[in-house]
Amino acid sequence: MIQITVVQIDNYGPWTVTPNPRRESDLQALQSRLYCDMNLQFGAHRGLAFYTRFDNIIAITNGIDLETHKRIQNSVKNRYPFTVSMAVASAETAYEAQKLATETIQEYGSAQDDVRKEVLDVANEFVSNGYVQLAHVDINDITGKLTDLETAYDTYLSVQMTKLKLMEELKKYDSMGFFIGGDNFMCPCNGMSEKDFLCMFEDIRDSCGIDLKAGIGIGKTAEDASNLADIGLEVIREGKTDFQVYTLKQSIEERKDITYNYMCPI
């Protein structure tokens, strides 16, 4: 089981133009700061957040309880000119968990409803014995094939096209994909096998002409899984395996050493 939290800014669209449209550079900076905060605060509890659309953030929160969510929510209220609503859900796959969390928030009203404020709800249950599976995917030799040859924008366009195709393919497995900078993508993918990734990469290569590789990490928390995925990707980069997908799994002994419910540092 994987636990997902959907974070949504309350009534954000109307706020950006009240009483007049706010300066775009300020809005971009504010959105980026919120994303930074969410990663720092969930990250302090071994979680991981993805910016998606900035006014909606998706976080992997295995091991993070309701009280910690409330503390993070209060921290936003105390330091930002808006509030956020949160919904938590768990499921066998990442896509299904975010779907349940999204539906829970939607039950309280529209994202632009000035009455709906600081929702905090749980769709089903908190995960105690679940796991997180993350794939760290990147493009093979993007520097030699794109960065050093194409314009900055054309390279960016190729990366975004790859991202879209990757996200579409991952959804077929009830998984998700998020761009994390450079040519890198982090993909919550509980239930997927190495064979699934190899087949998916072949389809992407045939349609986009882009070769991908992935380190897969399986751990009790998002932090554990992402660390293992990073190591797996390095194994491929260093030529220590002939395959384009490499999986590392956290041992039971390592899982027992993890303590949850740290005090939020911010």
UniProtKB/Swiss-Prot annotation:
Instruction: List the keywords (alphabetical).
Output: GTP-binding, Hydrolase, Nucleotide-binding
**Statement: the UniProt record of this protein carries the keyword Signal:** no
Q: Which reaction does it catalyse?
A: GTP + 3 H2O = 2-amino-5-formylamino-6-(5-phospho-D-ribosylamino)pyrimidin-4(3H)-one + 2 phosphate + 2 H(+)
The gene is gch3
Q: Which NCBIfam families match?
A: PRK02240.1
Its recorded name reads GTP cyclohydrolase III
GO annotation, biological process = biosynthetic process
Could you tell me what this protein does?
A: Catalyzes the formation of 2-amino-5-formylamino-6-ribofuranosylamino-4(3H)-pyrimidinone ribonucleotide monophosphate and inorganic phosphate from GTP. Also has an independent pyrophosphate phosphohydrolase activity.
Give the superkingdom in one word: Archaea
Q: Which GO terms describe its molecular function?
A: GTP binding; GTP cyclohydrolase IIa activity
* Stated family: Belongs to the archaeal-type GTP cyclohydrolase family.
Q: What is its EC number?
A: 3.5.4.29
The scientific name of the source species is: Methanococcus maripaludis (strain C7 / ATCC BAA-1331)
